[in-house]
Amino acid sequence: MSYEYSEKKIVAVLASNLEAGIALNVIGHLAVSMGAYADEDIMGRKVLTDNSGIDHTGISKYPFIITKVKPSRLKRLVDDARQEESLLLVDYPKQMLTTGHDDELAEEIAKVDNANIEYLGAVIYGDSKIVSELTGKFTLWK
């Protein structure tokens, strides 16, 4: 498998005011969604076999960086990323914390104008240059 490792990247951006437990929940949901909707090109080898013959499920072949920004900056990022059609954007609205079933979430989101949605996180995948232009000045999550 030959490819350019730095050609594309994945950047998760979390609201800087999240507690660690909520941040982990947000990133978990975002990562599952990203994996489900990304093209097959995002994945490296399906299986990695160790020296003992044990198979390990493969992971993304591109860098996955986790950052944080103020909630207002996160909102602008989501809006800006939506303008770049070549990017895959997955967002996590605050309503996901107060709803259970997917149908409940759909009902709650349908009641809110985009201008009033508060995002707790987002993941962007695509061309490294474009993703870096949008997220390059953000603080790494530590």
Please report, for each region that a protein language model flagged, where it lies by residue.
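Positively charged, small/polar-rich N-terminal and surface patches that mediate targeting and assembly
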Residues: M1-K142
